[in-house]
């Protein structure tokens, strides 16, 4: 449940409002998809835009709680839009560009490091952080039981679909890695033993 735990912690830190326009950078990531599902379940009228590096997954994203997509070309969004809230999953590599797209009074929550860069370089907070905008973070290394309980209650109350994208058996671990790392990779997968996988497939 760590993926949804991280997504819920980020959602709470962003203080979502029903009228918000939200950007999720790295929309096809597991946390990105979980966040979009959680947000739409409680706030069905929010407008969620996901950033992707190509438009090939647009159809899939629009069936996973996203309203629109924007192309992220080499760490820069190909849009002039501004957003009330931004979930930053790429990390320090794109934070400066995210601040170029935050609306007055907006919040950026830095949760991921998918860009492979761990630290901010040449970052002047007075210049980079817009007036009346905010940056926060969420880190799931220290699990809080109260938040974990809140997660399961949230999923039950809002009937959130938490099913994984794909299910693999133990023997299919190489295929699972290939799927996640390939161009068709999308969201999270689950590895289970063969007997349980057969029961899972029967339910579908």
Where are these predicted regions, by residue range?
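Short acidic active-site motifs
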Residues: 74-78, 93-97, 147, 172-175
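Non-catalytic, hydrophobic alpha-helical segments
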Residues: 7, 151, 173-176, 191
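C-terminal capping/lid region of NAD(P)-dependent oxidoreductase domains
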Residues: 157-166, 175-204
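N-terminal Rossmann-like NAD(P) cofactor-binding module of classical short-chain dehydrogenase/reductase
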Residues: 86-87, 109
């Amino acid at each position: 449940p760590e993926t949804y735990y991280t997504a819920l912690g980020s959602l709470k830190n962003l203080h979502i409002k029903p009228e918000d326009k939200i950007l999720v950078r790295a929309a096809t990531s597991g946390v990105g998809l979980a966040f979009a599902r959680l947000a739409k379940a409680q706030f069905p009228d929010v407008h969620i835009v996901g950033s992707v590096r190509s438009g090939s997954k647009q159809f899939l994203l629009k069936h996973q709680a996203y309203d629109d997509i924007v192309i992220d070309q080499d760490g820069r969004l190909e849009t002039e839009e501004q957003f009330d809230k931004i979930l930053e999953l790429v990390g320090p590599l794109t934070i400066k560009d995210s601040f170029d797209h935050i609306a007055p009074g907006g919040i950026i929550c830095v949760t991921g490091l998918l860009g492979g860069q761990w630290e901010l370089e040449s970052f002047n907070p007075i210049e980079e952080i817009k007036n009346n905008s905010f940056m926060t973070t969420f880190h799931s290394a220290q699990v809080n039981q109260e938040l974990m309980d809140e997660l399961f209650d949230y999923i039950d109350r809002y009937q959130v679909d938490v099913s994984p994208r794909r299910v693999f058996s133990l023997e299919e671990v190489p295929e699972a890695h290939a799927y996640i790392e390939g161009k068709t990779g999308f969201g999270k997968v689950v590895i289970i033993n063969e007997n349980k996988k057969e029961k899972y497939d029967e339910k579908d």
